[in-house]
A protein has these predicted regions:
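Extracytosolic ligand-binding ectodomains
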Residues: 1-126
Length: 126
């Protein structure tokens, strides 16, 4: 088995690798969508609207846009020099994680999920 990152954690990997995918492990930033109430809702809406599985980075992009939009709304402007100080105070219950920043702008609580291919499917390891 191989340990990989989020780019390996796809249905396409299992499709291409076939039975050889069994036992491979992949890490993904954030929480598994199915483990977060808003994540499940996002996945359902995405599939209904686009008639396909969620793209690899779509959930992270969605969270990033929501955080920046919230900061712009609170700042009352889109001017970066006025949005940035507000951004550091944002607390957002996202679909991939609870998002908050420290004084240097880093995530306060980075999260990682680990999956393993079992019976031809990615399964979240506890």
């Amino acid at each position: 088995p191989v340990l990989g990152g989020e780019t390996m954690n796809t249905a396409k990997f299992i499709e291409l690798a076939g039975p050889a995918a069994e036992g491979h492990v992949a890490s993904t930033p954030g929480a598994a969508l199915a483990s977060r109430p808003k994540g499940r809702e996002f996945a359902e809406r995405y599939r209904a609207r686009f008639q396909q599985e969620i793209g690899l980075y779509a959930p992270y992009f969605y969270d990033a846009v929501m955080v920046v939009a919230s900061a712009m709304e609170r700042a009352g402007t889109t001017v970066p020099s006025k949005v940035l100080p507000v951004l550091r105070n944002i607390r957002h219950a996202g679909i991939t994680a609870d998002i908050a920043f420290d004084n240097t702008g880093e995530l306060q609580q980075a999260q990682l999920s680990v999956f393993k291919v079992q019976n031809g499917k990615w399964v979240l390891l506890q």
